[in-house]
């Protein structure tokens, strides 16, 4: 059983389907990233799981609490930390007083509030601004403070809606390093993002979403399952016989640039030995071999493109 269990979860707004039959299990201590374009249903999913909006159909449990059940709603709020899309911070409170206020709401003791405030603000590079009013903060600083607010009661589950959006590279690195620390603490995290590089660095698994879940897996697994690698072979001379031999080993187009021939391959460990053998048999004098793996962005765009084509066909 997972800490987050979602079964056939859907949400409609009138005739518009925002989330369509989402089924997903997220294990304890896992960092899971939802990827998708605007309007894909990522924020709606987080809002449903946090109990902020109701579902149209389906079922979900978070940390043992059934989402939408009034008997466990209070417990659910205590077990889940939420960084929403909009910060919703009081502009006249300082960073430290903001965390103290929310800590009191959750019943955190005075001593523990002070310890967590110092730890969270230090880790998110806000400690030097702890006594400054939120109205003086940049958008990125408010975003980091919102993450700290979500953790003031030390919840085992954390939902983050675009945690690195609007951050400069330094701010994004601060948040990324912070998430890696949380990951080491075995906290279960569900985040959504447009930042594919961030997801690749932080997430154990990712799901590509476009109202429904298109694909789920590790970043490496998705790349290998949906996109081709390429092997580039530099030769003394590229002859017609070498090109023919390379094409006979690949179902995709072979390209030639100068003395380098590039061949798409599905599984390099399986296909490259056969490719090298065929080129050598055709008289090719191989000087250097290199390989390139598809990026997560290429995989993401390929899957989204296929999904859009399927929707048009349907």
Identify the residue ranges that each predicted region occupies.
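Helix-to-loop junction immediately C-terminal to a conserved catalytic motif
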Residues: 50
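Conserved ABC transporter NBD signature motif
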Residues: 58-69, 75-76
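Conserved ABC ATPase "signature" region
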Residues: 100, 104, 111-129
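Hydrophobic anchor residue at the start of the ABC signature
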Residues: 147
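Catalytic Walker B motif of ABC-type/P-loop ATPase nucleotide-binding domains
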Residues: 158-162
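ABC transporter nucleotide-binding domain
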Residues: 176-266
């Amino acid at each position: 059983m997972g800490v987050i269990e979602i079964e056939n979860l859907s949400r409609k707004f009138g005739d518009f389907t925002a989330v369509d039959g989402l089924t997903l299990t997220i294990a304890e201590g896992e960092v899971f990233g939802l990827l998708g374009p605007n309007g894909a249903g990522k924020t709606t999913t987080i809002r449903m799981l946090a109990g902020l909006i109701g579902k149209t159909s389906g079922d979900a449990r978070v940390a043992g609490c059934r989402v939408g059940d009034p008997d466990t709603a209070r417990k659910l709020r205590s077990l889940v930390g939420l960084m929403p899309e909009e910060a919703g911070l009081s502009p006249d409170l300082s960073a430290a007083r903001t965390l103290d206020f929310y800590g009191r709401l959750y019943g955190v003791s005075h001593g523990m509030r002070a310890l967590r405030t110092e730890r969270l603000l230090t880790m998110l590079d806000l400690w030097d601004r702890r006594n400054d009013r939120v109205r003086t903060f940049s958008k990125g600083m408010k975003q980091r403070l919102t993450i700290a607010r979500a953790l003031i009661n030390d919840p085992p589950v954390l939902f983050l809606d675009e945690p690195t959006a609007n951050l400069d590279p330094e701010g994004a690195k601060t948040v990324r390093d912070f998430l890696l620390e949380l990951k080491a603490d075995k906290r279960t995290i569900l985040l959504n993002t447009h930042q594919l590089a961030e997801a690749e660095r932080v997430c154990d698994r990712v799901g590509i979403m476009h109202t429904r879940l298109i694909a789920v897996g590790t970043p490496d697994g998705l790349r290998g399952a949906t996109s081709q690698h390429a092997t580039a072979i530099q030769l003394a001379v590229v002859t017609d016989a070498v090109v023919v031999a390379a094409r006979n080993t690949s179902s995709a187009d072979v390209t030639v640039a100068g003395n380098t021939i590039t061949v798409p391959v599905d599984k390099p460990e399986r296909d490259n030995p056969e490719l090298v053998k065929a080129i050598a048999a055709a008289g090719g004098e191989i000087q250097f071999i290199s390989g390139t793996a598809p990026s997560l962005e290429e995989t993401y765009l390929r899957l989204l493109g296929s999904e859009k084509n399927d929707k048009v066909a349907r």
